[in-house]
Amino acid sequence: MFKPHLLAVVSRCNSFFGCVDICCNWGNSAPRTLKGLKSVTSEQVFEREQKYGAHNYHHCSAYRAKGVSLDMEGKRYFDFLSAYSAVNQGHCHPKIVNTMVEQAQRLTLTSRAFYTDVLGEYEEFLTKLFNYDKVLPMNTGVEGGETACKIARCWAYMKKKVPENQAKIIFAENNFWGRTLSAISASTDPMSYDELRPYMPGFEIVKYNDTAALEKAFQDPNVCAYMVEPIQGEAGVVALDAGYLTEVRELCTKYNVLFIADEVQTGLARTGRMLAVDHEDVKPDLLILGKALSGGLYPVSAVLRDDHIMDCIQPGLHTAMDVMDPRMRILAASRYYVRVARERCENAQIQATYLRKELNTLPKDVVPVVRGKGLLNAIVINKKFDAWDVCLNLCKPTHGDIIRFATTGHHRGTDPRMCQYYQKYH
């Protein structure tokens, strides 16, 4: 069974709401008798998942994540992963948890055959917040991407008059928006798409951050949309050049192509603005949100767009079984989180400046590049070093409260000294 060296946890950047802990461990320490802890070790957790679960992840164990957190052995860790930006506000936010429990005790599930008192309230709040006419809620981030693609194709045939079965959607090289067949059909990572053919037709790739290549692709009159992440997280936190999104907006308008912004990871203040596209004050035709949208308690996504695009979706064409049920109450609660997120944008910028300043003190022969925006950041490890070996060195047992990392590839990470910073100021 795969077991990394002793113990390690986490990469990417932590919550902009301060230092919120998550309990994780790679190790085999004996269980401690602590109030509220199960009598089970991390080793037992690993073995059970290895035996009964699909082997699609190498991960840590976690028992509790709230405030000061504990793992199976009672160890405490700082969460610099934030569930890939799904828990920007921290784990188990009490207001959101309490609201969801309250709703679950009242009504848990209906279908779209019924109205509820929550959905319209949520839709009004979200559309007014981001200045769109309509929102289509879904369950997961990848469903948000799928929904945006379906809307784009409908718009292509109904409004742009693209010939039947000829609509094309352009994606940026090294994109990542999920693991469905549609998402992997847009991928350029062999680990995502190998041995899963045939792929979705009508998807084409252009180089990321290259407006000349994009304009050349737009010469094809059958191109109906361009989907892009303002910062490519899975590719290694790769940000676009300043001015790129402004040019994309201009090109999409010029060639009558829909601009789709995938803000599943970057949205809701992660980059220091409510949306990453806000750094250039551009408005996409379709906006995809997810992850932190629910406050980290439930898979929820949303696609926002204006009426002239929304009108292409007719009754029966697209829905989801569970997405409209009263669990939307959690989204009503998440309005509190979104409001706080707006207030915390400036705080994210302040913390990010400090973080990158400290990261830039790392040895340049090992870490030549530090990149990111707001509190979505990465370090690039020199290719002559093996990233795993570097992490093992970082993971050596230390005294005190130094963070230990878990990472793969030649990017991602953070600085142990951030522990001291957050202990001092939070």
From Swiss-Prot:
Catalysed transformations (reactions): a 2-oxocarboxylate + L-ornithine = L-glutamate 5-semialdehyde + an L-alpha-amino acid
Pathway(s) served: Amino-acid biosynthesis; L-proline biosynthesis; L-glutamate 5-semialdehyde from L-ornithine: step 1/1
Keywords for the protein's UniProt record, in alphabetical order: Aminotransferase, Pyridoxal phosphate, Transferase
Entry's Gene Ontology cellular component terms: cytoplasm
A GO BP annotation: arginine catabolic process to proline via ornithine
EC number: 2.6.1.13
Pfam families to which the protein is assigned, alphabetical: Aminotran_3 (PF00202)
Cofactors, names only: pyridoxal 5'-phosphate
Enzyme class: transferase
Family annotation (SUPFAM superfamilies): PLP-dependent transferases
PROSITE patterns in alphabetical order: AA_TRANSFER_CLASS_3 (PS00600)
Residues bearing PTM N6-(pyridoxal phosphate)lysine: K291
One MF annotation (Gene Ontology) recorded for this entry: identical protein binding
Family the entry assigns: Belongs to the class-III pyridoxal-phosphate-dependent aminotransferase family.
PANTHER family: AMINOTRANSFERASE CLASS III, ORNITHINE AMINOTRANSFERASE, MITOCHONDRIAL
Protein name as it appears in the record: Ornithine aminotransferase
Species for this entry: Vigna aconitifolia
